[in-house]
Amino acid sequence: MIIGLGSDLCNIERIQASLDRFGERFENRVFTDVERAKAARRPFTRAGTYAKRFAAKEAFSKAVGTGFKRGVFMKDIGVVNAPSGAPTLALTGGAAERLAAMIPPGHTAHIHLTLTDDHPWAQAFVIIEAIKD
């Protein structure tokens, strides 16, 4: 059963402006080590790489119904790739706790994530599914 749905649209140029203005301070505050390493490998599309991940974090916060409140922080939500290459989320801290609180007993959470970009926009959709054990 679907227990959460979130989407976000992010302006890549806005992310580039934050990178230009705040540099590593912005990167370290918002993105995980894995996300920063991926962006560093993509110097010509770094802002787009970050914008998709920023949108994914926003979409997840909407899917769990809290936004960035109640202990859910951007850095607790990391975009990673499954062995198949598909994007998914790795959660820690308050984000993981909020997701666990939403899942009914006898179910396991499954997060579906899709990312896309077409300059100047990046977009993410998150669907949280509870699958019966």
From Swiss-Prot:
EC number(s) from the headed UniProt entry: 2.7.8.7
What's the domain of life for this entry? Bacteria
Q: Which UniProt keywords apply?
A: Cytoplasm, Fatty acid biosynthesis, Fatty acid metabolism, Lipid biosynthesis, Lipid metabolism, Magnesium, Metal-binding, Transferase
Any single Gene Ontology cellular-component annotation: cytoplasm
GO MF terms held by the record: holo-[acyl-carrier-protein] synthase activity; magnesium ion binding
Q: Which SUPFAM superfamilies did the record assign?
A: 4'-phosphopantetheinyl transferase
According to its UniProt record, this protein's enzyme class is: transferase
Report the main location listed first in the record: cytoplasm
Keyword Cytoplasm among record annotations:
yes
Which cofactors does this gene product need? Mg(2+)
Give the binding site residues for Mg(2+).
Answer: D8, E58
UniProt xrefs under InterPro entries:
4-PPantetheinyl_Trfase_dom, 4-PPantetheinyl_Trfase_dom_sf, ACPS, Ppantetheine-prot_Trfase_dom
Show the catalytic activity.
apo-[ACP] + CoA = holo-[ACP] + adenosine 3',5'-bisphosphate + H(+)
Cell compartments where the protein resides: Cytoplasm
An annotated GO BP: fatty acid biosynthetic process
Gene3D superfamilies associated with the record: 4'-phosphopantetheinyl transferase domain
- What does the UniProt record say this protein does? Transfers the 4'-phosphopantetheine moiety from coenzyme A to a Ser of acyl-carrier-protein.
Instruction: Output the NCBIfam families linked to this UniProt entry.
Output: acpS, pantethn_trn
- Similarity-based family: Belongs to the P-Pant transferase superfamily. AcpS family.
Give the protein name, as stated in the record: Holo-[acyl-carrier-protein] synthase
The record lists the organism as Sphingopyxis alaskensis (strain DSM 13593 / LMG 18877 / RB2256) (Sphingomonas alaskensis)
